[in-house]
């Protein structure tokens, strides 16, 4: 009870605090997805979206946030609440984007942390799952474009080059060197990258 309020709030010390979309990693970490392609190539709702793993994960998080003293869901303040708590040493784990280590934790002179992938659903899950996060960019081609095939080819080319050339460079030159300075976190980034999933 770091705030001496005699009630649980985001100013206390916890194992885990999250808010908003920062909890999405748990959904994807369970192996679930929102949509997928069917046998005809059409995008449909994934059966995992309402599956048992998602229900169990939500129940586990609700127990953590509302029925224990180990976690809290911050309803006000968004990401800075858990980012600052982590940087002040009041938080054991947080889920967030990689850039937080550079722009939020570094100014707090907090560098005693490790990167780990989102936990597996259970010990039987074969691999980790990491989503790119909700702030990723989606591209569309206007219906009145003069040459939709060429526009599609252009976007596909840049997506391919980004995946094969840009993404490895970002991981090797930024995430594994600029954002962390220990070999264990660098290895963890290799695990994260090897298990990235896209929800389409």
Annotate the PLM regions.
Residues 106-177:
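Extracytoplasmic/periplasmic substrate-recognition and gating elements
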Residues 184-200:
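C-terminal capping/gating helix-and-loop segments adjacent to ligand/active sites or protein-protein/ligand interfaces
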Residues 96-101:
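Beta->alpha turn/N-cap motifs
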Residues 62-69, 156-163, 197:
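Sec-exported extracytoplasmic/periplasmic mature domains
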Residues 9-15, 67-70, 88-92, 108-114, ...:
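Loop/turn elements at helix/coil->beta-strand transitions in domains of secreted/extracellular proteins
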Residues 20, 25-76:
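Glycine-centered hinge/linker elements that transmit conformational signals in sensory
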Residues 79-94:
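Short helices/loops that flank or line small-molecule/ion binding pockets
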Residues 58-62, 83, 151-159:
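Non-transmembrane alpha-helical segments in soluble domains
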């Amino acid at each position: 009870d770091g705030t001496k309020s005699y009630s649980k709030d985001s100013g206390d010390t916890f194992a885990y605090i999250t808010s908003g979309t920062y909890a999405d990693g748990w959904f994807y970490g369970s192996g679930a997805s929102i949509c997928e392609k069917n046998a005809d190539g059409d995008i449909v709702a994934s059966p995992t979206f309402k599956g048992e793993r998602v229900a169990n994960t939500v129940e586990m998080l609700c127990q953590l946030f509302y029925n224990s003293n180990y976690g809290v869901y911050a309803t006000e303040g968004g990401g800075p609440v858990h980012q600052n708590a982590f940087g002040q040493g009041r938080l054991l784990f947080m889920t967030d984007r990689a850039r937080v280590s550079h722009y939020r934790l570094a100014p707090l002179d907090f560098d005693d942390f490790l990167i780990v992938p989102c936990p597996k659903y259970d010990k039987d899950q074969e691999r980790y799952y990491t989503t790119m996060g909700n702030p990723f960019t989606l591209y569309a081609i206007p219906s009145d474009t003069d040459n939709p095939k060429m526009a599609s080819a252009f976007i596909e080319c840049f997506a391919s080059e980004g995946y094969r050339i840009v993404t490895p460079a970002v991981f090797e030159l930024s995430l594994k060197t600029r954002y962390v300075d220990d070999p264990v976190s660098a290895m963890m980034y290799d695990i994260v990258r090897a298990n990235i999933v896209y929800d389409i």
